[in-house]
């Protein structure tokens, strides 16, 4: 009799994806982040489900319902802070996962990469709508500012914004629909993640050298399942330390003040994981130009397969490209810092320089350096 995991129609799929999956023998800890993202998504869906049982999406009671969760619901404070900080952990893993893909040339798997970029957009949309739900000052004004950006679209902009708002300002209708979308999007993300895996398993995993590894593969279980479990435990340790010791470290104190349309906070800024894009948006004086730069700063990821000029896939043996990759990382840190600063000199100038550098490195410098490396290697 055949082993049930190889013969059962459902278990067979799991077996081919997580047990008998042939995996390169040399993949490093940087390949852990895919499974960690799955782990984060499960945490977010479970905690979110429990929060949704007590939350009310009405402008009059939303803020009070979150307070009620923290004070009166058993372990409500824990669930709420796990959900809020879970988003931060999700984005940390997401950025590291994308960074690994860029460094080791994983973007040459077109379908997997493009589904991944769509996933990034979906996660960003979900996080933005989730930030609006507690209905604090930063929730309200963040929603107002970000949705207002759509008014920069010629002809249909204003109508589009009012259609999204469900009125002439961010109000009850906006909150209700944001809650509905915030609830349903994680399940769409889970489905997209499965498509992402499906495309990945068509080609097999990349590895640090970027070379074909068909001749040297090992089964995923037990080797990498144990490695992923270790990664999950380390993530859980960092995550629970954050939740239990400094749950408000990454939040904004303004969000502990109920939303007031008559009082604007001194500095309106999104959560830390959007600050790099926010800095790019602010560094362009023109509204439409800023919005286009904002969208393109993420959409540019889809161009990486086209901009890949090197004869080698990975950056492992390309020291010049490595150098500029790390300059790009430093530039993103700079943009994140600038996004949280007030709009005044010298921050405006630093933001503009960092924004130009971001696009220059990706569109001009990295492809040029790749061509130079090809020349140096006489390829």
Swiss-Prot record:
Cofactor: heme b
Gene Ontology CC annotation, any one: mitochondrial inner membrane
Name of the coding gene: MT-CYB
Residues that hold heme b b566 according to the record: 97, 196
GO-annotated biological processes: mitochondrial electron transport, ubiquinol to cytochrome c
Binding site for a ubiquinone: 201
Protein name as catalogued: Cytochrome b
Organism expressing this protein natively: Hylopetes phayrei
Segments traversing the membrane: 33-53, 77-98, 113-133, 178-198, 226-246, 288-308, 320-340, 347-367
Principal subcellular localisation of the protein: mitochondrion
Note: Heme 1 (or BL or b562) is low-potential and absorbs at about 562 nm, and heme 2 (or BH or b566) is high-potential and absorbs at about 566 nm.
Family recorded in the similarity comment: Belongs to the cytochrome b family.
Entry superkingdom: Eukaryota
Record: residues binding heme b b562: 83, 182
Membrane topology: Multi-pass membrane protein
Pfam families assigned: Cytochrom_B_C (PF00032), Cytochrome_B (PF00033)
Textual note on the cofactor: Binds 2 heme b groups non-covalently.
InterPro entries: Cyt_b/b6_C (IPR005798), Cyt_b/b6_C_sf (IPR036150), Cyt_b/b6_N (IPR005797), Cytb/b6-like_sf (IPR027387), Cytochrome_b (IPR030689), Cytochrome_b_C_euk/bac (IPR048260), Cytochrome_b_N_euk/bac (IPR048259), Di-haem_cyt_TM (IPR016174)
Subcellular location: Mitochondrion inner membrane
């Amino acid at each position: 009799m055949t082993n049930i995991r190889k013969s059962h129609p459902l278990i067979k799929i799991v077996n081919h994806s997580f047990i008998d999956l042939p995996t390169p023998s040399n993949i490093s800890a940087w390949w852990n982040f895919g499974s960690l993202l799955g782990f984060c998504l499960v945490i977010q869906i479970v905690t979110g489900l429990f929060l949704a049982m007590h939350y009310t999406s009405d402008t009059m009671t939303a803020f009070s319902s979150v307070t009620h969760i923290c004070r009166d619901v058993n372990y409500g404070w824990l669930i709420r802070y796990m959900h809020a900080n879970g988003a931060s952990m999700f984005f940390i893993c997401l950025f590291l996962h994308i960074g690994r893909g860029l460094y080791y040339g994983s973007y040459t798997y077109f379908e997997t990469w493009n589904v991944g970029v769509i996933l990034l957009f979906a996660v960003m949309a979900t996080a933005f709508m989730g930030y609006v739900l507690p209905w604090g000052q930063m929730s309200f004004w963040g929603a107002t500012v970000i949705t207002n950006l759509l008014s920069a679209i010629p002809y249909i902009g204003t109508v589009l914004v009012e259609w999204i708002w469900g009125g002439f300002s961010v109000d009850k209708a906006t909150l209700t629909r944001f809650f509905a979308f915030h609830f349903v999007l994680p399940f769409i993300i889970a489905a997209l993640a499965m498509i992402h895996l499906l495309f990945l398993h068509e080609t097999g995993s990349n590895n640090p050298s970027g070379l074909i590894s068909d001749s040297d593969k090992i089964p995923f279980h037990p080797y990498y399942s144990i490695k992923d479990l270790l990664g999950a435990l380390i993530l859980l340790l960092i995550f629970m330390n954050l939740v239990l010791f400094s749950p408000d470290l990454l939040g904004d104190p303004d969000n502990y003040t109920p939303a007031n349309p008559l009082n604007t906070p001194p500095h309106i800024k999104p959560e830390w994981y959007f600050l790099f894009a926010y800095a790019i948006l602010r560094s362009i004086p023109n509204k439409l130009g800023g919005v286009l730069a904002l969208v393109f700063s993420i959409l540019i990821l889809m161009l990486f397969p086209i901009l890949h000029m090197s004869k080698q896939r990975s950056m492992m043996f390309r020291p010049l490209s490595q150098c500029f990759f790390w300059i790009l990382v430093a530039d993103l840190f700079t943009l994140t810092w600038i996004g949280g600063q007030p709009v005044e000199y010298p921050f405006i100038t630093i933001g503009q320089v960092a924004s130009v550098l971001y696009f220059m490195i990706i569109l001009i410098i990295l492809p040029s350096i790749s061509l130079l490396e090809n020349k140096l290697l006489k390829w």
